[in-house]
């Protein structure tokens, strides 16, 4: 991965010296969370505005409040209207004469100006877009870029969206004589080493001889193929290294545009050789190997850091998921940041690239449905053109749980209550297709799929959609345009897929929706808890928590073990995308405010794994897993259910203070129904029901009678001191020169045992490190945020203090220096960054 990154830097550096100069435009912006006339004008006084660098999310800096119109589903954080301004100058001797600005993402309703001239508006908050600055650029004086961001029409999202210019911004300089437009390089490969490259270009109209020169480099920077000719070319790489899961071997394709033999512009892209196949009987194949898509759905926020892109936080997320055994990411439910796809390419993750959460029918008052008719073709085609060269992408999703699955009768007059009824209940036969004549909704599905195929015609990437209506009369399915059938939930219907969709490959595009709070356990653990019983019924519990045993889920969903069993034991199921990998801000099902973040994640909002993480790790990886839970701090004599996830062992035995509580083995059952699609069923944990007594509980794993591993949990005493552990140190390759560090904070007793019920308020401070130049200056690091995974914590994310939640919290710091943690009556702790 380092070699690949170094090669990309070399190539970009080379091009910046000659034909093209693309530079970050993130630094030196001014911002105000206000709105008044004249802010778009170049001479508007902005001297009192706040200085900041992008990416930026202003909502995460705000206070939680039930009065914020985003509601608990939107994270109960503020929206509003914000303005950004950036002053810059251009070298009057600049050789370039064409200037464009690219925004990777602005949420939402952005309007951009240059020197008082309006460049355009882009409503969709997840689209990448470009404007040509050339006609208005001032080469002899000050230039002012102004961006208005209007996220005041709330609610407009079913989850936390963030507010502002939350992704990167780029300034690109080229020559007007001839240039390659945005996303003008299209690269497609075959596993046999065939490469097809098409390069679009624009020219000034003068008489000139144009040609394209393509060069392919391997990961070591060696030229492995080259050609020169017309716009579309075919090349061959001999014995290519295949791109694979966990082995993201990347080639680089450099396309140079030549005028009369001189290079005037260049575009580069990574490329990978892999063979992707979906099969109706055997599921999914990569490079000829039959395997399961072990995926998760991910929203775009980074917990306490909000929606603003942070490459270190992004890489940390992927690293934690990879260690769990995840091999695929679904970008739920919108186009992802380009950096996520770059990382998935290099780390070897599969990707379902998703476009929309709604089409013409709205799910919330201010959502994208109001822009769909005018903007969907532009937004979808831009997504495909931007992302089509990424080898990690194996399928395109044109929508998630869109209400067009059901009848188009009164399509635009549904109330939100009616829409939610259809969305969550479904299965009303009267709203499904009743003839072979295609409905408006089926035709719309075909239209969207056609756009995908138009802009990605060379690579076999199927079109799918996340559908929570499993009936084959679903209007999306009736269209015939869905290449891979995707069910959201409904694992009970999976057995009928081969009958209902003959010849069609199948995946669970969204699954599970278990509800869990890290560190909280509801007993008896063999009881299944569902909440709410029906989606429209209010659910309240004084704890505002959900059980961390795998025994609590939403009414439309299942436990982790139940759905994994279906996926594992049915060959035709290509895999699943679990809802979700990480908790995310917003959508706090089953609760209302003060809950403000989700319970769905296998990993909490702070990035701390819940217990089910280890079930997947025991099934999806070759790591040795032995995970006993819960903690061992209870009332004397209290009946406690102890669970254990394990692998690579025949049996496990539990001991309390040295006394055996019995041996357990995971059970594999025979076929539930001999003739149906389900072949067998498996237990993925073992359990002991025991009486608590202070001391220690130990589990021992054996194979063939030989002890393999042991785990001991001791009864913790009173909180005594803090322990700081750097769990992730950022990489300069992904972030800036000041990497982001994540530090886990544990409250422990005098012997170092975690205090599982500790909720101490912990205060953080940072100090700088000595300057490397020897001038004696101090550079102070910054606390970016704090979190503890508690869904009802109303402490501001940007505060420098946080209560421990079940003994733990996390602090995020940017820069180098020392972090100090303090709490009343506890010994301090510090760690060097």
Residues of each region from the PLM?
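Bacterial Sec-dependent N-terminal signal peptides
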Residues: 1-21
